[in-house]
């Protein structure tokens, strides 16, 4: 803890700058699309699905655009997300979200409050109907999520609530299991 595992090189610095630029441009584009589709166009189910599709496709492009990061999808269970469900995943890096949400447009993520309020992508999170659960699952949130499941959306939960500094698996909060019931 406290020491870099990799030295900073010009190559790493350029890759980081490029990746962050792609991220910022993608955030601006998705925020604009969300505003046009869901604020001006109205929050119809059709527009919500369109926005989720743009989000999913943007993540697919971003994953391919990040230099030095390979993405290989191994769908050994042949999951096609034709039925909604609860997706429980551990959370090791910022890339986890992109890799998970690129799988299907009908995925809604439970998030922390700081992500909900993030200046870079908070609007995208709100347009996509991702829900903050930092304070736990209240009845209002559970009802919103039930409605999303009835509309065919799967719910993505990182039950640890945050990423660990050393990539170890942290304590699982009970909300994921409560929601699954």
Language model features: what each stretch is:
Residues 1-6:
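Short, Lys/Arg-enriched N-terminal segments with co-localized hydrophobic residues
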Residues 7-72, 123:
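A transmembrane-helix-recognition feature enriched in membrane-embedded lipid enzymes
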